[in-house]
Each structure stands twice: as C-alpha cells, then as structure tokens.
Swiss-Prot record:
<protein>
    <recommendedName>
        <fullName>Small ribosomal subunit protein uS13c</fullName>
    </recommendedName>
</protein>
<dbReference type="GO" id="GO:0005739">
    <property type="term" value="C:mitochondrion"/>
</dbReference>
<dbReference type="InterPro" id="IPR001892">
    <property type="entry name" value="Ribosomal_uS13"/>
</dbReference>
<keyword id="KW-0694">RNA-binding</keyword>
<comment type="function">
    <text>Located at the top of the head of the 30S subunit, it contacts several helices of the 16S rRNA.</text>
</comment>
<dbReference type="GO" id="GO:0003735">
    <property type="term" value="F:structural constituent of ribosome"/>
</dbReference>
<dbReference type="InterPro" id="IPR018269">
    <property type="entry name" value="Ribosomal_uS13_CS"/>
</dbReference>
<dbReference type="InterPro" id="IPR019980">
    <property type="entry name" value="Ribosomal_uS13_bac-type"/>
</dbReference>
<keyword id="KW-0699">rRNA-binding</keyword>
<keyword id="KW-0934">Plastid</keyword>
<comment type="subunit">
    <text>Part of the 30S ribosomal subunit.</text>
</comment>
<dbReference type="GO" id="GO:0019843">
    <property type="term" value="F:rRNA binding"/>
</dbReference>
<keyword id="KW-0687">Ribonucleoprotein</keyword>
<keyword id="KW-0150">Chloroplast</keyword>
<dbReference type="Pfam" id="PF00416">
    <property type="entry name" value="Ribosomal_S13"/>
</dbReference>
<dbReference type="GO" id="GO:0006412">
    <property type="term" value="P:translation"/>
</dbReference>
<comment type="similarity">
    <text>Belongs to the universal ribosomal protein uS13 family.</text>
</comment>
Amino acid sequence: MVRLVGVDLPRNKRIAYALTYIHGIGLTSARKIIEIANINPETRTVDLTTEETVALRQTLEESDLKLEGDLRRFNGLNIKRLNEINCHRGKRHRNNLPVRGQRTRTNARSRRGSKKTVTGKKK
C-alpha cells in the first residue's frame, strides 16, 4: 500500500486516479505530477516501485500545491475571515445557506438540511 501526504492510495487503481484521493489533487494535476515524475500513466498503484514512490513524494514536495491539511486549514481560515468581517458571504456561511446566489425558496435542501414538515391547521 502506497502512502503519500498522509493518505493511503487505493491499491488496484491507475496511479492518476489514485492520486485524486489526496485532497487538493484533481485528475489534471495528477496527470501533470505523473508526467513530471516520469511514471507510466498506465501503472497501477500496486505495481509502483520504491523509486517511483520516492519520485512521486519528491514531486509533491517540490510542487507549490496546497494539499490535505494545509488546504483544509486555508479554506477554513478564508471562511472564518468572511464571518469576522460580517460580509454577505460570511452571513450565508454562518446560516448554512447557499453562498453563490442560488434560490432558497425551493430546493437548496442539501445545504439547508432535511425538509421541515409543517402541519396544516385543524378546524
């Protein structure tokens, strides 16, 4: 099992798709990392040699990408800053509402939580 940046990569996936399990690496950046590290894109995680894993580690360390904990901390601090300056986006984050202008009269259930049932009036 290959472990990079504190993440266990899945064993039987191709290395480009396995790298996407690291927070902050998408498929495009994974392919660039593999190209820089001179690894065959068809290689599965199980078949990586120790030299290839070392090359991957060095490539990730030398890249200017924010990964895993650093990226999560960076995003958390940005949201915290928005809350502190009391801007519209900060208020939306604080109230667990959609931030980017989506409608909330209907839909937005994934952001607002499960449906709240309202009982009708009894006569």
